[in-house]
Structures are given as C-alpha cells and as structure tokens.
Amino acid sequence: MKLTVKLLDIENRGVLLHCTDARSMRVRDGDRVQIVDEATGKTAQAHVDTTGSLIEPGVIGVYRPVNATLAVDEGTPVEVRGAERPASLEHIKKKMDGGRFTKDDTVDIVRDIVDDVLSPGEITAYVTASYINGLDMDEVEYLTRATVETGERLHFTRHPIVDKHSIGGVPGNKITLLIAPIIAASGLLIPKTSSRAITGAGGTADLMEVLAPVSFPALEVQQMTEKVGGAIVWGGATNIAPADDKIITYEYPLRIDARGQMIASVMAKKFAVGADLVVIDIPVGRNTKIATAQEGRKLAREFIDLGERLGMRVECALSYGESLVGHTIGPNLEVREALAVLEGATEPNSLIQKSLSLAGIALEMAGKAGPGQGARAAADILRSGKALEKMRQIIEIQGGDPNVKAEDIVPGECRFDVNAPQDGYVIELNNSALVTLARLAGSPYDHGAGLLVHAKKGTRVRKGDPIFTIYADREWRLERAIEVGRTLMPVLVEGMVLERIPHERWV
C-alpha cells in the first residue's frame, strides 16, 4: 500500500496507521510492517499503532527512531506492507517455557534488539524470561560474544589493558573515581566504559557526568585513553555492546538485574574494549545482590570461567556490602567525597581502603607491584598527588574543568535532617531503603539529590542527633522522600538494652 509520510517527533520504535488502512492491510496494533522508500531503497521494520483521528487515511505516521533509519522527509510516498514475525520471538517463547537458547537463537535475538526489530514489550519479555529461568554458562558466553559482535571494538597497540567493574548492590560505591586515575597514573591503560544506574541511585557514568561529558564515540574513547592513560565514559554512547544498553533500558523500570545477563553485560564490555586484565568487585551482605560469601565465590568462579573462555584474566574480590561506601549517595555528594580523597582527605576509610585494595589487585596482576604489595603501591600513587593529577587530565580531555575542587560540588538546596529517635547505637543500615530514598529525592537524574549519612553502623548517637540528611533539587521530591522515609526505616537505632521484659508477662 502506498502511503504518505507524516513525521512524528516522538521516541517510539513504531509507526501510526489510520484504522481503515490497517484493516485494508490486515494488520492490528502490535503487528509489524515494512516501510520502503523506493526512491532510495532504504527500508525499516516497525510495529504498528492504530488511530481513528490522529492521522488521516492514506498517511503513515513515522516516529523519530524509525525515521533515523529511513531518513525521509515529510510528504514522502512510501510502500508499506505487512512483515513476518521475527524468529527471535519463538526463541524468547522457548525460554519462557523453560528451554535454553542456542548460539543461533542468541545471535537472532541480539541482532533484532540492536536493529530495533523487537518492540519494547518483546524485549521486556526476553529480559523477564532470562531473569526467571536463568542462563547457563554456554548461554552466557553466546550472549557475551553476540553482544560484542553487534557493536564496535577498541584495538590498542599497547598492552596490557586493565579494566574493573563492580556488580553493584551497595550504595555510594564511587570507587572508580579513585581506581581509574590510580591505575592510569601507574602507566597502565584503563578505558573505563560505565553504565548509568539500573537499580541504584547513581552509576559511575552518572557520577562522572558531574565532572565532564561522558558521551563519546568508540574511536574517541580509544584516542583519549592512549593520550592520558584512561577515560571514564558512558558505554551507551559508544556503540560498544549496544544491545546491552538497550537491555538495561528495560531492566531499569523493573529494577531487575538478571544474573546471566549481568555477567554477559560486564564481560562483553570488557572484551569489547580489549581488556587483558579485569578486576571484579562483588559486594556481599544483606540487602545486596549477593547475600553470602558462598554465593559470591560461585559468582566469582563464573566470571573467571567466562574470562578464560574469552581469553581474559579475571580476578574477583568479595567486599563488605552491608554498609554504604563512604558517607554519601547521589552524584554530587559522591563526586565531592571522591574528589576530597584525591585532594588528600584521609576519610572516609571505607572508600579509601576499598579503592586501594582493588587498585592494588590490578597493579599486582599487571606486574606493577609484587604479590601482596599492590595496595601499598596504590596508596603511594594516591598520596603523591599523581592520581589527582591524572584525574584532572581525564576530566580535561573529556571536556570538563580540570581545576574543579571538591568544595565546588554542592548538593541540592532542599534538605531534611532525619534525627535519632533515642540515645543508642546505629545497629542497621538498610541499603535498599537508603537507595529508594535517594531515588525518590531525584537521584541520579537530579545531580544534587541524594543522602549524606552521618552515623553508620556501630556509631553511638544521642536523641536528636542527625543520622542522615536527604538532599533534593526540588521541594516536591524532597517531600515525597520524607513521606516514604517515615515507613521505610532505613536506619535502626537501639540502646544497649534492647527490650525490657517484665515479670508480669510470664505470670
């Protein structure tokens, strides 16, 4: 059927048909059509929405993402015809029924995700099926390789290339802002592609964006890394492992991070940037993704095994995950805390020690420090000011202000102190509840939003002492966080005597 294009400036991978045209073509909402610009030969496949009033018969509404492929002008005549269901839908249905993906199944699915053949609902079905039924190690390898092969790769002439990753689950984990410049200052290359927050209140890319732009094409990431030793960028802008970033888009609203997909996501990006040596941080503890050390060791073995399949040397570190790293959650607050350490601050100890330990593992793997001497070598680089200077170089080459100081980074203007209800000790910090409050306050999208935790687990407090402060850029977000915070109880305070049990209760 010949239809005339009407461009619709809406972010939707589909087209809009008048219901009479849809009936003539025997297509319904959710079906697919193929659009062909016969003048240029360009084609695109899209799912269908129908309307009886928004457009006229004889017109096809083309949403912005579809026209990124077609590149047609308003009023262009195009040929529109029904399209077959992609085979990848049958593969997804098989996984929903408890089956397993073959290598070819995985290639079909990943290619259709990258080419925008699958609708948002279909990608969500894939994410959910993989989450519920899991992926075995062969399926994880298939997904990793397919994710890399459908995107760009970096090719360095100097080796080894070092990379690190934290699987998340613990708030305030701003360690990359220290580890990357320490490793780069040692003379190694670290092209750190990072993701934005999925279930947390700020991914590394969200934090780095406070200091400098993070969206760069792959070639520029390689050039920046070769010039100054490192970069901290958003992987979603590089076309490195593009399927992964699209999958993350659908994991985010569900707040799920399927284990097999998580392993493939991490390792695909490391493989694509040419990493030889990889350090994986696995936080362990209640209210984290990994509850026990036994489970953490199992996950570590899976990372190491996949690394061997891909030709990378991987080492993992189980880290304490029952309390936030440092005292801050949210982009501006975390960046300010990390910059202060680079500038010479000796607190917070949890941030400094974790960063030095993980950087030290990388230095030992690369032969820059002897066995057991890595953390000390990393500390020497930090204390000497070389890491700060390297971070300034990274900020500058990415287009930020290299002279920025910790004191220049300020939290949101709206704030609320949550005070201790009684004298006692902080006996628990609920990570997931703290993250929920930070997100309600606007983090990570509002850079000034987040939490400053004054009293961590084991701290003695007096009634009325501030336990944590909520910051927000907008008053209504702060009010919402306060309202929900009254029911979440993210921090528990108890006296040394937990409960009095009188004689009368047992008479």
Curated annotation (Swiss-Prot):
Q: Where does AMP bind?
A: G169, S195, R196, A197, I198, T199, G200, T204, S265, K289
Identify the enzyme class. Answer: transferase
Keywords linked to the UniProt accession: Glycosyltransferase, Transferase
Q: List, from the UniProt record, the residues annotated as the active site of this protein.
A: D257
Under InterPro entries, the record lists:
AMP_phosphorylase, Glycosyl_Trfase_fam3, Glycosyl_Trfase_fam3_N_dom, Glycosyl_Trfase_fam3_N_dom_sf, Nuc_phospho_transferase, PYNP-like_C_sf, PYNP_C, Pyrmidine_PPase_CS
User: Which GO terms of the molecular function aspect are on file?
Assistant: 1,4-alpha-oligoglucan phosphorylase activity; AMP binding; pentosyltransferase activity
EC annotation from Swiss-Prot or TrEMBL: 2.4.2.57
Pfam families given in the database record? Glycos_trans_3N, Glycos_transf_3, PYNP_C
- What reaction is this protein's catalytic activity? AMP + phosphate = alpha-D-ribose 1,5-bisphosphate + adenine; CMP + phosphate = cytosine + alpha-D-ribose 1,5-bisphosphate; UMP + phosphate = alpha-D-ribose 1,5-bisphosphate + uracil
Tell me yes or no: is NAD among this UniProt entry's keywords. Answer: no
> Could you name the Gene Ontology cellular component terms for this entry?
cytosol
Q: Which domain of life is it from?
A: Archaea
* GO BP: AMP catabolic process; pyrimidine deoxyribonucleoside metabolic process; pyrimidine nucleobase metabolic process
**Family affiliation:** Belongs to the thymidine/pyrimidine-nucleoside phosphorylase family. Type 2 subfamily.
Q: Please name the HAMAP family in this protein's record.
A: AMP_phosphorylase
Q: What does this protein do?
A: Catalyzes the conversion of AMP and phosphate to adenine and ribose 1,5-bisphosphate (R15P). Exhibits phosphorylase activity toward CMP and UMP in addition to AMP. Functions in an archaeal AMP degradation pathway, together with R15P isomerase and RubisCO.
Any idea what this protein is called?
AMP phosphorylase
- The organism encoding this protein is Methanoculleus marisnigri (strain ATCC 35101 / DSM 1498 / JR1)
